[in-house]
Amino acid sequence: MKYIGAHVSAAGGLANAPARAAEIGATAFALFTKNQRQWRAAPLIPQVIDDFKIACEKYHFSAAQILPHDSYLINLGHPVSEALEKSRDAFLDEMQRCEQLGLTLLNFHPGSHLMQIAQEDCLARIAESINIALAQTEGVTAVIENTAGQGSNLGFEFEQLAAIIDGVEDKSRVGVCIDTCHAFAAGYDLRTPEACEKTFAEFGQIVGFQYLRGMHLNDAKSAFGSRVDRHHSLGEGNIGHDAFRWIMQDARFDGIPLVLETINPDIWAEEIAWLKAQQSEKAVA
């Protein structure tokens, strides 16, 4: 079964996120559990936790259908020790918030070397950052998102994702989220079913489908291999509809959150309905 949704707002309270997801016909959703532009947030109080859990139950969202995202400020591969510690503390806080909310996944961007340390050293720092957080939490999987490779961001090659996983001690609590826009911008072709087969065969060989814990379904304004991160609405960008139809018809993408981060929230309900309709092999554009 496919879990399909979008990254919804938690404005006004975390309990509003499941309601907003249900309003657009979603069977999955992503959210920030705190302001993503701030390092710290007030601790979660029991009422907020209870209200969120009640809302998830009311709208029929299990933890397997929810893919929270951490703060964009965090850099788990930071070359400067003091800044690295700040990021590690913030990431641990994000993991603990998920644990309190009964969530089992936390999606994050791996990190950046900022042109100051070697790529290998940065990847090792990211893995160690994950180990530190996992040692102090229970039940939450750290889900590494592939990047477009913009600037000095790592995680844009499958080999880099595999290297991070290799350095994580508890393999049962590390996973990957593949963003289609990021993959395309990083040079993984998705424009035809044949290209999708090739790209995901490579993913399966290098990373392994056992680590796939979520996806971000985004078309790309950016050009193939450009290493520029610019999302677009489904079918409106340089990837086109075929990739998303192909994903909907492949059982390897069942049972994980498939989350839209496309640029027009006003048509998320339409995009979700279209994705649901593509699950039939008879589906056409």
Swiss-Prot record:
<dbReference type="GO" id="GO:0003906">
    <property type="term" value="F:DNA-(apurinic or apyrimidinic site) endonuclease activity"/>
</dbReference>
<keyword id="KW-0378">Hydrolase</keyword>
<keyword id="KW-0540">Nuclease</keyword>
<dbReference type="GO" id="GO:0008833">
    <property type="term" value="F:deoxyribonuclease IV (phage-T4-induced) activity"/>
</dbReference>
<dbReference type="GO" id="GO:0006284">
    <property type="term" value="P:base-excision repair"/>
</dbReference>
<dbReference type="InterPro" id="IPR036237">
    <property type="entry name" value="Xyl_isomerase-like_sf"/>
</dbReference>
<dbReference type="InterPro" id="IPR013022">
    <property type="entry name" value="Xyl_isomerase-like_TIM-brl"/>
</dbReference>
<comment type="similarity">
    <text>Belongs to the AP endonuclease 2 family.</text>
</comment>
<dbReference type="GO" id="GO:0008081">
    <property type="term" value="F:phosphoric diester hydrolase activity"/>
</dbReference>
<keyword id="KW-0479">Metal-binding</keyword>
<dbReference type="Pfam" id="PF01261">
    <property type="entry name" value="AP_endonuc_2"/>
</dbReference>
<dbReference type="GO" id="GO:0003677">
    <property type="term" value="F:DNA binding"/>
</dbReference>
<protein>
    <recommendedName>
        <fullName>Probable endonuclease 4</fullName>
        <ecNumber>3.1.21.2</ecNumber>
    </recommendedName>
</protein>
<feature type="binding site">
    <location>
        <position position="145"/>
    </location>
    <ligand>
        <name>Zn(2+) 2</name>
    </ligand>
</feature>
<comment type="function">
    <text>Endonuclease IV plays a role in DNA repair. It cleaves phosphodiester bonds at apurinic or apyrimidinic (AP) sites, generating a 3'-hydroxyl group and a 5'-terminal sugar phosphate.</text>
</comment>
<dbReference type="GO" id="GO:0008270">
    <property type="term" value="F:zinc ion binding"/>
</dbReference>
<feature type="binding site">
    <location>
        <position position="179"/>
    </location>
    <ligand>
        <name>Zn(2+) 2</name>
    </ligand>
</feature>
<feature type="binding site">
    <location>
        <position position="109"/>
    </location>
    <ligand>
        <name>Zn(2+) 1</name>
    </ligand>
</feature>
<feature type="binding site">
    <location>
        <position position="69"/>
    </location>
    <ligand>
        <name>Zn(2+) 1</name>
    </ligand>
</feature>
<feature type="binding site">
    <location>
        <position position="145"/>
    </location>
    <ligand>
        <name>Zn(2+) 1</name>
    </ligand>
</feature>
<keyword id="KW-0227">DNA damage</keyword>
<dbReference type="InterPro" id="IPR001719">
    <property type="entry name" value="AP_endonuc_2"/>
</dbReference>
<keyword id="KW-0234">DNA repair</keyword>
<dbReference type="InterPro" id="IPR018246">
    <property type="entry name" value="AP_endonuc_F2_Zn_BS"/>
</dbReference>
<feature type="binding site">
    <location>
        <position position="182"/>
    </location>
    <ligand>
        <name>Zn(2+) 3</name>
    </ligand>
</feature>
<keyword id="KW-0862">Zinc</keyword>
<feature type="binding site">
    <location>
        <position position="229"/>
    </location>
    <ligand>
        <name>Zn(2+) 3</name>
    </ligand>
</feature>
<feature type="binding site">
    <location>
        <position position="231"/>
    </location>
    <ligand>
        <name>Zn(2+) 3</name>
    </ligand>
</feature>
<feature type="binding site">
    <location>
        <position position="261"/>
    </location>
    <ligand>
        <name>Zn(2+) 2</name>
    </ligand>
</feature>
<feature type="binding site">
    <location>
        <position position="216"/>
    </location>
    <ligand>
        <name>Zn(2+) 2</name>
    </ligand>
</feature>
<keyword id="KW-0255">Endonuclease</keyword>
